[in-house]
């Protein structure tokens, strides 16, 4: 009788092994679900980035406002008749003024 019980126990373990640790077992399914969640998070970030880039491209194709903004920000260009004003933080302004006054002398 013991032999039958032990053999049944061994067969039960042999049947359960693929379910838990095999190629398509629960552990693999759990790992895959985690990978899918990570990939979905990455995809949503990339979709937001793509939407922003698509808006930039559309604005560059259709309007001049984006081109003017890029020229101002990236290249420091200004329109004719405009004045460029740069406001420095309070701690930097006195130090830069002192440097400028010593350089001019």
Swiss-Prot record:
Chief location of this protein within or outside the cell: membrane
Residue intervals passing through the bilayer: 4-21
Highest taxon of source: Bacteria
Membrane topology of the entry: Single-pass type II membrane protein
UniProt feature coiled coil, ranges: 32-60
Gene Ontology terms: cellular component: cell division site; cell septum; plasma membrane
Periplasmic face residues: 22-105
Places the protein is found: Cell inner membrane
UniProt xrefs under Pfam families: DivIC
Record topology, Cytoplasmic segments: 1-3
Assembly description: Part of a complex composed of FtsB, FtsL and FtsQ.
PANTHER family referenced in this protein's UniProt entry, alphabetically: CELL DIVISION PROTEIN FTSB (PTHR37485:SF1)
Name by which UniProt lists this protein: Cell division protein FtsB
Highest classification ranks of the organism: Bacteria, Pseudomonadati, Pseudomonadota, Betaproteobacteria, Burkholderiales
């Amino acid at each position: 009788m013991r032999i039958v019980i032990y053999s049944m126990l061994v067969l039960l373990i042999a049947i359960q092994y693929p379910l838990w640790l095999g190629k398509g077992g629960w552990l693999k399914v759990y790992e895959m679900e985690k990978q899918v969640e990570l990939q979905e998070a990455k995809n949503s970030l990339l979709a937001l980035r793509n939407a922003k880039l698509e808006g930039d491209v559309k604005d560059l194709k259709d309007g001049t406002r984006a081109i003017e903004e890029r020229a101002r920000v990236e290249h420091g260009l200004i329109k004719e008749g405009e004045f460029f004003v740069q406001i420095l933080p309070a701690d930097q302004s006195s130090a830069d003024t002192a440097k400028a006054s010593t350089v001019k002398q």
